[in-house]
Amino acid sequence: MRLLVAIALGSLLISSMNGADIERAQALARARDSERQQFHARYVINLSDPVVTQIEVITEFRRLVIIAEEHVRRGDWMFTRSTRAAEEALATTRGVITIKAYVRFSPLNTFNEPPAYALAIGAPAKNSPLQGVSTQLTPQHSVPFRTPDRKTLSSLIGVSLDTNVGADRIGQATRAIGVTLDGKEVARTTVDFARLD
């Protein structure tokens, strides 16, 4: 509980992590499941939209927590005690925020390839325009199944969208994060980056 209070008191988008921030992230990775789940919940926004189901934010601080948690799962507890190892793990993603969105398709869809969904960022005002950002699409397929003529197929059931944005572009402000299809807004939510580590 004290760890969560310390995180809440120091919570703001950290543009450049120092040794104390790294140690705090590593301590969180060693914390109880309930504390880690509570931490991660701030970064995952579940939407009521039937198509765009979730938007997730991964800051540099959270990325280190995720990396350290993976090391702990593999039994490598020493990673969570080494500032140097953490700095090396973050070297290629310094100052980068990853934004993800998950799009679910109707089970009756006939897509051979995923439609051109994209992530977009804008001002928090409801009617403010969103600016598209370079987005990587990763198709999600169903479990393979056999057809009556003995072919093995799988259907396209969704897509995950990913983008990397410089923390300096986002800043410590509230931003609208949206998903567009052919330039038209499909879903939108706001994220207060000043409240994230």
Residue locations for each model-derived region?
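Positively charged n-region of N-terminal signal peptides that target proteins for export
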Residues: 1-4
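Bacterial N-terminal signal peptides
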Residues: 6-14
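Conserved functional micro-motifs across diverse proteins
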Residues: 17-197
